[in-house]
Amino acid sequence: MANPSKRIMNKKSKQASISSILNFFSFYIMEYFVAVDNETPLGVFTSMEQCEETMKQYPGLHYVVFKYTCPADAENTDVVYLIPSLTLHTPMFVDHCPNRTKQARHVLKKINLVFEEESIETWKVSVNTVFPHVHNRLSAPKLSIDEANEAVEKFLIQAGRLMSL
């Protein structure tokens, strides 16, 4: 676990990281996302503005589940991604299309200013227990809203187990 004294948690860095995440996702067509607060779905939203407002309003926000289609990759079907709230010192995961590698790495670096040295690999292992095909763009999962909620619940259980080890 990273040293809490090394955390960069001031308002400017958190806002910069939120902006970086939203700028990254603006490359894609967002279909919906589900925000989860303390393991309870807050609702389904359809705009970047709602996403940003939700992140600001809920300091205890755990995870946000995005479902969108990437127009830059014709092979890519609807994909579900998980990213954490910036207020939690937890691992994080952001996947991306092959031709968006530079932008994705930039976002990962920005988020790591907040999350520091948490293991991205550990996060990927835990995500794969919920979304076994998330890295395979030809068989990416297509989830309904209910299925997304269920996947989040399963993910939170798996993430809790990993973090308690």
Swiss-Prot record:
GO cellular component annotations of the record: host cell membrane; membrane
Transmembrane segments: 16-36
Protein's UniProt keywords contain Heme: no
Keywords: Host membrane, Late protein, Membrane, Transmembrane, Transmembrane helix
Induction behaviour: Expressed in the late phase of the viral replicative cycle.
Membrane topology field: Single-pass membrane protein
Keyword Ubl conjugation carried by entry: no
First-listed, main subcellular location of the protein, grouped into a coarse class: host cell
UniProt subcellular location: Host membrane
Family per similarity comment: Belongs to the asfivirus F165R family.
The protein's name in its UniProt record: Uncharacterized protein F165R
Organism: African swine fever virus (isolate Pig/Kenya/KEN-50/1950) (ASFV)
